[in-house]
């Protein structure tokens, strides 16, 4: 199938290569994996930008035909709970922007996942002029309502 377009998928903590069942790795990781590989089967080229949480993998890993996972340095190259990642989002956004510029790839759309990636997508839209689509996966107000004091999401 011929190439239909390029998608920059922003997924700051849900790396599709993560070991499922480990801390902060579950349904959203599966979603990112399935959507990115599904888009590739339809002829799109997808780059999944995720925060480097280990020094081990190379910067770019081929996930499947037409799908690359791009590890962006933002904070230490170690696991950080997603609720503590906000402080690293400006560096993550700048790393995504710099990587896109260095690779000279033209994307047709940004697809962001989770609220922090949504912020990154808004910033990239302003800098690169790209449209974006977003999925929250969870809404803080609903989580707080259901989980009460057990919810560890940042207040806001």
Language-model features, listed with the residues they occupy:
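Catalytic cores of nucleotide-sugar-dependent glycosyltransferases that transfer UDP/GDP/TDP-activated
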Residues: 1-156
């Amino acid at each position: 199938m011929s190439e239909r377009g390029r998608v920059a998928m922003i997924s700051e903590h849900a790396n599709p290569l993560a070991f499922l069942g480990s801390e902060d790795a579950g349904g959203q990781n599966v979603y990112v994996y399935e959507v990115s590989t599904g888009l590739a089967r339809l002829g799109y080229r997808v780059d999944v930008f995720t925060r480097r949480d280990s020094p081990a993998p190379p910067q770019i890993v081929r996930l499947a035909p037409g799908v690359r996972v791009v590890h962006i340095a933002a904070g230490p190259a170690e696991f950080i709970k997603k609720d503590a990642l906000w402080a690293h989002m400006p560096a993550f956004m700048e790393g995504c922007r710099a990587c896109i510029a260095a690779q000279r790839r033209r994307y047709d759309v940004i697809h962001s996942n989770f609220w922090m990636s949504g912020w990154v997508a808004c910033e990239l839209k302003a800098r690169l002029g790209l449209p974006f689509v977003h999925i929250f996966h969870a809404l803080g107000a609903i989580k707080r309502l259901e989980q009460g004091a057990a919810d560890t999401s940042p207040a806001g």
